[in-house]
Regions:
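Flexible "arm" and connector segments at domain edges
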Residues: 1-149
Length: 149
């Protein structure tokens, strides 16, 4: 059944409000960090940046194929550890990240989003606005958007 465009979803919730907020602020911070690390010392082509996003998604696929998933429970326990000398804490946290989070499915998805947000800030794209517009439009479309998959 095709939804008629209105200000409510099938469940009656209003969707004319911003559903996606904070991404533009995150994009600014990510882009500033990337500039500080030298990733923007020279202008970068949009196509290259988009392919870097694709490569991160490919790494997420590979992590999934290998069954590599983040163990946040163990990582959070490591963060709570109070028997670590303050001078060793940074090394301990880095080691915990590398063994429990790095190169996992979730880590690669995070890398993908970071690259997308960096690109959006660099190109002046208001991603929050575009996501909200797309969500609103998609709610007006038929089931599965009229496609098999």
């Amino acid at each position: 059944m095709k939804n008629k465009q209105s200000n409510t979803t099938e469940k009656g919730m209003a969707y004319d409000r911003m559903l996606c907020t904070g991404l533009n602020d995150a994009a600014k911070q990510i882009h500033e960090d990337a500039k500080r690390k030298g990733f923007w010392d020279s202008e970068r082509e949009t196509g290259t940046l988009l392919m870097l996003c694709v490569s991160e998604l490919s790494e997420a696929v590979e992590a999934d194929r290998k069954g590599r998933y983040a163990d946040l429970k163990a990582y959070n326990e490591c963060e709570k550890a109070d028997d670590i000398f303050e001078s060793d804490k940074e090394v301990y946290e880095l080691s915990s990240f590398q063994s429990l989070i790095k190169d996992t499915f979730e880590d690669e998805l995070a890398d993908t989003v970071i690259r997308i947000l960096d690109l959006c800030c660099a190109r002046g794209t208001d991603l929050e606005k575009h996501i909200n517009l797309k969500l609103k439009y998609n709610r007006s479309r038929e089931r599965m958007h009229g496609k098999a998959y």
